[in-house]
Amino acid sequence: TKYRIFWSHMEAVNTIEEIQHPGVKACLNYLKIDKGIEVNHAGDLPARSGLGSSSSFTVGMLHALHVLQDQPVTKHQLAMEAIEVEQNVMLENVGVQDQIQCAWGGLNHIVIDRDGSYTCNPITPDPLFEQHLVLVYTGKQRFASDIAKEQVSNFDKNSTIIEKIV
């Protein structure tokens, strides 16, 4: 067995194509990893929580694979690779903000340009403010790709309003 993947399933396969975990499979394919590997993935959040857990996994997986190959990687590179993997390898209809935020970590002001480039400026909040930040899981589940698809389909309908905002 060349690849062992432990998540809600236990996989022991010989080729990347046999891997069922979509994120692991996509990252291994993207970075052309052909040596055997074992991945253990345990998450506290259920899938489709809307809290960026998929992008967190993709960024973390890519980072781990780069480290295993002794390849230095920047936060910017991790973000761009995660976007590429999720949008063009996994073919998910997702945005870019989750991947950027996960790659950079912390609290940030992110400006995303129309051409896909971005700037990420870390924010150092007052400690009192930090003590009062709360992340809330609502228990609702949704597919980010469905939401993104709906937003894109509504773009033409709402383009006048969007242009005024931008």
Question: Over which residues does each language-model region extend?
Answer:
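Residues at or immediately flanking beta-strands
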Residues: 36-38
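DPxDG-like acidic metal-binding loop motif
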Residues: 51-71
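Short pre-catalytic strand/loop immediately N-terminal to key active-site residues, enriched for Gly-Thr
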Residues: 43-49
